[in-house]
């Protein structure tokens, strides 16, 4: 084995995790044959030079993130995560199934609440969720779709079984890194990339635009779509810019929009133009100061009323956050059975509902063994990994749980699967998760082949979030047949403003938006 992999098998064995590239020992799995062969031919100098080249490219293209106040290129490791076709088939079916169930759940809880009446979930589960918005109860979104875009976080446990870890149907973020990672890795490891059939990811913008246009208000033959961003200070602004550009639509801020007569218009250099579909990248609380936070400068007054009247489609729909609630997550297998009459394709991670007395007592006796998460947390913030926590941290956690049991869940510590990752002068096993992205047009749920593989760059760490020092990998889904290139979309010919304006935003807004969009 290459010197780059010295001591790898020993480190992988110590982790106790399922390794994506190697079976126990040093034999590469069949799906990794081309990657293994390519890496064996490279020296440390070769690998380091390619890694540095990818980082420079990311910096030049603006593929960056803010870490402790410093703008850095988003870390991309040179070893891809490879998923064979048969495993992807399971993931694809499981993600699509979950999206359909969450779509049905959201439509129900903002309507008849049959799921409550039939005793599948308690009413308090819905009404006590921080992101259940009564302001949008009782109306159907234009186009009839609530979950246009989703990111379902999936992990593989020590036995090699895929499990859903989290649902993201509010403002799922990260697909820009999927697109940019593929662009970089096609050049970063061409010896392996060009020797096998890898499912393309470049179709995502076309699929997204098609779904947004299909769910436009009735009677609109040629809908105008915009991407609504909080502005240049937002941590995901690069993604907003990239997607708007790739779809050929306008990127707007709240102050570019006007609501009048339950219609939405954008200010352009040629005058006002009606907007039919808003792909919002703003959390609900900041979307409409007439309905939510009155001090918000990020949205536009009247958007919710316009949506209620059917004058505009907002994607994702306002109120979706209730489905992101981690306590609701624990009921999703039941929701799949209730709405779809199917068994879950991908199981949940075992979850303790701390609002239940018996579960709470059991967890409080085992805090040092479990992962405890706030139900409305994101970006890995607020969770406590028991084995890594100090006695003081566990005592503080105990008090918070007792003060607000509804606000917490607990799960066993999963040894997430590992993939070789460059660390210093060699590759070491590092834990990964996977966020497949799905696009729902109302008739079909399309799952982007692969998704965002996030990697914990610190040895032994289970925290993969970029906001806490994580990185990413390109995700290669293998196919048995050659893949066709994606069709490029036309660019927009409308100019909203001559220049993107930079305007001050309160720091707490920036922080909250950053947290919400991990």
Feature-to-residue mapping (PLM):
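Preference for protein termini
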Residues: 1-518
């Amino acid at each position: 084995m290459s010197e780059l992999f010295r001591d790898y098998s020993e480190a992988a064995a110590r982790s106790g995790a399922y390794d994506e590239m190697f079976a126990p020992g040093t034999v590469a799995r069949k799906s990794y044959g081309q990657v293994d062969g390519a890496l064996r031919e490279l020296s440390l100098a070769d690998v380091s030079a390619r890694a540095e080249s990818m980082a420079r490219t990311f910096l030049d293209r603006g593929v960056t993130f803010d870490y402790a106040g410093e703008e850095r290129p988003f870390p991309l490791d040179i070893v891809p995560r490879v998923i064979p076709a048969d495993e992807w088939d399971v993931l694809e079916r499981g993600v699509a199934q979950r999206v359909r169930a969450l779509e049905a759940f959201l439509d129900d809880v903002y309507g008849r609440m049959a799921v409550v009446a039939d005793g599948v979930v308690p009413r308090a589960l819905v009404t006590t969720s921080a992101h259940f918005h009564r302001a949008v109860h009782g109306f159907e979104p234009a186009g009839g779709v609530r979950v246009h875009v989703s990111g379902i976080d999936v992990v593989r446990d020590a036995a090699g079984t895929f499990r859903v870890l989290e649902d993201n149907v509010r403002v799922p973020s990260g697909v820009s890194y999927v697109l940019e990672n593929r662009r970089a890795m096609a050049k970063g490891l061409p010896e392996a990339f060009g020797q096998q059939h890898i499912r393309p990811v470049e179709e995502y913008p076309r699929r997204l635009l098609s779904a947004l246009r299909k769910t436009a208000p009735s009677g609109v033959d040629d809908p105008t779509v915009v991407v609504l961003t909080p502005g240049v200070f937002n941590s995901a602004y690069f993604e907003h810019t990239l997607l708007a550009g790739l779809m050929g639509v306008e990127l707007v801020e709240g102050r570019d929009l006007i609501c009048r007569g339950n219609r939405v218009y954008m200010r352009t250099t040629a005058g006002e133009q009606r907007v039919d579909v808003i792909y919002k990248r703003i959390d609900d609380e900041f979307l409409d100061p007439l309905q939510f936070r009155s001090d918000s400068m990020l949205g536009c007054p009247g958007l919710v009323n316009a949506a209620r009247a059917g004058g505009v489609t907002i994607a994702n729909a306002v109120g979706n956050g209730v489905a992101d609630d981690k306590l609701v997550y624990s009921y999703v297998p039941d929701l799949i059975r209730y709405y779809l009459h199917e068994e879950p394709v991908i199981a949940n991670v075992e979850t303790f509902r701390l609002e239940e007395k018996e579960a709470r007592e059991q967890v409080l006796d085992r805090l040092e063994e479990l992962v405890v998460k706030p139900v409305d947390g994101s970006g890995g913030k607020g969770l406590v990994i028991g084995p890594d926590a100090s006695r003081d941290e566990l005592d503080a956690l105990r008090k918070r749980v007792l003060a607000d049991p509804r606000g917490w869940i607990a799960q066993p510590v999963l040894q997430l699967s590992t993939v070789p990752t460059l660390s210093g002068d060699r590759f070491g096993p590092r834990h990964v998760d996977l966020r497949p992205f799905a696009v729902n047009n109302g008739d079909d749920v399309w799952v982007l082949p692969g998704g965002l593989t996030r990697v914990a760059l610190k040895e032994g760490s289970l925290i993969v979030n970029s906001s806490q020092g994580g990185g990413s990998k390109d995700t290669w889904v293998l196919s048995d047949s050659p893949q066709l290139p994606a069709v490029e979309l036309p660019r927009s010919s409308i100019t909203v403003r001559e220049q993107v304006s930079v305007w001050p935003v309160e720091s707490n807004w920036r922080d909250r938006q950053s947290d919400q969009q991990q």
